[in-house]
Structure formats: C-alpha cells, structure tokens
C-alpha cells in the first residue's frame, strides 16, 4: 500500500512492531512486511503471506525505484523457519537496489528478534518481549484516527455477504428488478433503442447514487438492486470507474455486502479501485478476491490484480483515466450487444421463496 497515514514517530523495534498493524490495517501473522522510507518517512508498506511463492518479491526493486525509496524496514511474523528465508530474500533485493535496511525483525508469540543487531545485551537469543497494546505508538495512532483490526479475517468480514433479513430483502428486491427489466425488454420493439435508454438512465443513476452517498444518503434495496443490474453494462460501470475517489469506499463496500452474488464483480472491482486509490491495497486485494471467486474471467478485476501484484502505485492513473466524453467516443453509441452481460445475469435468476 502507499501510505497516506498521519506521521508516527518510531524509535525502537517495539515501536516498529506497534506501528505495522496500523500501516497494513490489521495485526498480521505468517506475514512479511516491507516498509519503504524516503527522507525518513514511510512511503509504502507492502505485505505478503508466508511462505512466499517463488518470485513473489520480484516487484520490490521496481517499487523502490518508482517511489524513491532509500531505506527500508523488514518485519516477518511467524516461526524462524518460515520467516528467515523471506527476510533474507527481501534484504538481498534491497541491497541490490542500493536501499539500506535500517531494521529487520522477526516477531513471534510476543517476542522479537533482530537480524541486524547481534548484541546479546539488547537482542538476546531468546528474543525480546514486546506488547503492542501498551506502546505509545498504538495510543498515538488511535488518537490520530488510525485503526488496526485483529486479523485479516476481520477485515474480510467487513465486506462479507450480508445475511438474515438483509439478505432476504435484497433477494426480493433483486427479483423485482430482474422481472421489471425482463418485461420491459420483452416488450421493446427496438432493442438498440432500449439499450440507449437503459444506458442513459443507468449513467444518471450512477451519478445520482454517488452524489447521494456524498451527502450522507444510502441506497434502499430497490435502488441498490437496480444499480447492480446497471453496472453489468460495461459503459455504465466505466462511468463509475472514471469517477473513482477514495471517499467512495464505504459506498462500494455497502453494495459489495448487499448485492446478490452474481452482481458482485463490478461493485467489488470498483471497491478495489477506490481502496487502491486511497492507499489500502489490502482491502483492494480482498475485494478483488471476492470478484474473481464469482467470475474468474472478470477483466477489470484481473487488471487491478495485475497492478497490485506488481506493487504499482495508483499515481500511475493520474491524468490517465478517460473522461465520460472520451468513453463515448471510444465505445460509440449504445446498441443491443451491450446488453449481453446483463441478459446473461437475468437468465441466472432463481425464484424467491415465499
């Protein structure tokens, strides 16, 4: 992730360990964290699951170069046999990139070990106890509004499918929206004209929904279901894409939880885009996992996954996202073929139990 967090002052290994959960959004385990610094401030914080697959750290050198990283801190969480090879590889890649590793730590079961310091008086073989909960860094981070969830699973649950009455109500609203579209489409004498009207209305609904969110509103079930159908159309989804802002994260989170599964890939991908733009690559990755679990071939999700795997910065998009007018020029006027992704989803509709 690209860090945009308020500055925290770190002066010891214990401070680093206390800060990491706030940099990645949760308390990691079985993980490798690399924090890149420039001019003494954290610019990026990246995380990998352990054990590392071959080549997982290859994007580090290009990342260091793009972000102007001159120093790094490496932290591994877990037992030595799992952490040490990963830390060694990260340190080697940093050295090749002429990035100085200021500290390299392993943390496990409430103790840490330094790979940089070999002095027994400060870094004993049995490890040094630490407690992130009592650290001044944790207190400072909390005051500054930073949050560290207990683990990655807790973060995953923030966009898990809604259940119970919420799910049942959304299922009914979706069935009604699908029935309405089917009836209107079946009665349309000209499918090209229907496509034009549908896309025009869908573009307006996207902008209205985002404006409502900005003023504190929330889509009701019927509006959410309708927007889920709209976003199946690539041109309508791309309208939302061109408008992406990190402030949209709660909006797309809500829809990722509420929509029926087959309508999730567009909204989860838009959530990933907004999260990535805001520097939260962990949430972006989780959202993309949701999208690709449902539709492994969904192109927007695969494109963003490629960017995240290569540790690309969202800054590459500055000035490069097309405008709505440019999308219209590139894609041409709406026509019946634009409806095919939506029609495929309509065909998947199942009866709702009474």
Where are these regions (language model features)?
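Short acidic-glycine loop/turn motifs at beta-strand connectors
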Residues: 37-41
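Short beta-strand scaffold segments in enzyme catalytic cores
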Residues: 32-36
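Charged, compositionally biased boundary regions
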Residues: 2-22, 27-29, 43-354
